[in-house]
Regions:
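Active-site-flanking structural segment that lines cofactor/substrate pockets
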Residues: 39-69
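Glycine-rich, aromatic-flanked loop segments that form ligand/cofactor-binding clefts
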Residues: 123-126, 132-168
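Flexible C-terminal active-site loop/helix
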Residues: 2-21, 25-49, 323-403
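Metal- or metallocofactor-binding catalytic centers and their adjacent structured scaffolds
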Residues: 50-52, 67-142
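Metal-dependent enolase-superfamily TIM-barrel catalytic cores that perform enediolate-based chemistry
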Residues: 152-257
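Conserved, mostly hydrophobic/aromatic
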Residues: 6, 71, 92, 131, ...
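Hydrophobic faces of well-ordered beta-strands that scaffold small-molecule active sites
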Residues: 76, 161-164, 177-181, 214-218, ...
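Shared catalytic-loop signature of beta/alpha-barrel
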Residues: 44, 232, 238, 249-370, ...
């Protein structure tokens, strides 16, 4: 491979009304916004009706381009919007520009260590993720290989996928390998809400028949007692797993939940966990049967591959959160990634559409319940050049002064 260096890092947000990596940033009606879905803010009446009421989509997408001195451009994305752009352009760029892109481990470690005073989780790691993914895209393009080949090659010819959706009946007809539906009500809704949750799952099971796997996404909304009570009530419908019931830092709660639900259903979590250190806690405390890191948030591919490798030593499956082309490459390359998630992002959950909206060209979509990746170099997707992107800190000097 020819000798190259990284010449520039550019961080963008999307124009108003564009979705990108933030799937909550919808215009018009949409099931993920308009249905009652339990969430951490459901305990407050004024924020119960919609997740967007409390600003879940306030920051939006960050899109990163990493350009090499030979003109190669790699792309990566996450959430975090303008604040993430600021971190990338003002702070992280100094550890990236001028580097050999093959030094991805060194670059990641320097970004991680430099953000420890204000980072460790959340926004800073999301910013690191976007940069890291863009570097891996560059590496694939330089070598003329897909990213999964850089990780050791494909362990499967195609990747089975399940649907996250409000319409499990349609997902079943499409050939998906199961469906995950949102938990509608939480502890603040009392026994009446519990009865409604049971009714929703009963209807789903009736629609799809006895053999189609069903899962429940609880989005950090429950308590340990409520989650145990709910899971036991749903056992009659052969619930396969209950997902992210508790706030991500409640490791003791997850361990208690897993012990209580052994033999009833699987416990999964990790969507809002960050870095291998967070997942080490989940593993060491026996918090989950399945781990669910999000490659666009957890630290990018460099960190996600460490997490998957660590999980394999404990015979733990990893089923990443989100239907991201980036995570598909990770899952292609590891044997302990048995199935992928696909978010059905059409407004009525009745069409298969790209997760990232119009952001990318050639985003892979499932057919008959499987994703098949090509041998296109890098991530195999290209930025849609007709989409309006805004670079909020383009004029920022690298020494930290905005001109």
């Amino acid at each position: 491979m020819k000798q190259v260096t990284i010449s520039e890092v550019r961080a963008y947000v999307m124009a108003p009304g564009e979705m990108g990596a933030d799937y909550h940033n919808q215009t018009g009606t949409h099931w993920i916004i308009d249905l009652p879905i339990a969430n951490p803010m459901s305990v407050y009446e004024e924020y119960k009706a919609k997740r967007t009421s409390w600003g879940i989509n306030a920051l939006g997408t960050v899109l990163v381009e990493v350009e090499l001195n030979d003109g190669t451009v790699g792309i990566g994305c996450s959430i975090g919007g303008e604040p993430a752009c600021y971190i990338i352009e003002k702070h992280l760029s100094r550890f990236v520009e001028g580097q050999d892109p093959r030094n991805v481990e060194l670059i990641w470690d320097q970004m991680w260590r430099a953000t420890l005073p204000y980072g460790r989780k959340g926004l800073a790691v999301q910013a690191i993720s976007a940069v890291d993914l863009a570097i891996w895209d560059c590496l694939g393009k330089l070598r003329g290989e897909p990213v999964y080949a850089l990780l050791g090659g494909a362990t499967k010819q195609k990747l089975p996928v399940y649907a996250t959706t409000s319409r499990p009946d349609i997902a079943s007809e499409w050939g998906f390998k199961g469906a995950k539906i949102p938990c509608r009500y939480g502890p603040a809704d009392g026994d009446e809400g519990l009865k409604k949750n049971i009714a929703v799952m009963a209807e789903a099971r009736e629609q799809v028949g006895p053999d189609f796997p069903l899962r429940l996404d609880c989005y950090m909304a429950l308590t340990v007692p409520y989650a145990i009570k709910l899971a036991k009530a749903l056992a009659q419908f052969e619930l396969e797993w209950i997902e992210e019931c508790l706030p991500p830092d409640d490791y003791d709660g997850y361990a208690e939940l897993k012990r209580a639900l052994t033999g009833i259903c699987l416990v999964t979590t990790g969507e809002h966990e960050y870095t291998r250190y967070g997942f080490r806690e989940l593993i060491a405390r026996k918090c989950a049967d399945i781990l669910q890191p999000d490659i666009n948030w957890v630290g990018g591919l460099t960190e996600a591959r460490r997490i998957v490798a660590m999980a394999s030593a404990y015979d733990l499956p990893v089923i990443p959160h989100g239907s991201s082309v980036f995570s598909y490459h990770l899952q292609y390359a590891f044997t302990n990634c048995p199935i992928a998630e696909f978010l059905v992002m059409s407004p009525a959950a009745d069409r298969v559409v790209p997760l990232f909206g119009e952001l990318f060209r050639n985003e892979p979509l499932p057919q008959d319940g499987y994703i098949e990746l090509t041998d296109a170099p890098g991530w195999g997707v290209e930025l849609n050049d007709k989409l309006e992107l805004l670079r909020p800190f383009e004029t920022m000097q690298r020494e930290g002064v905005i001109s």
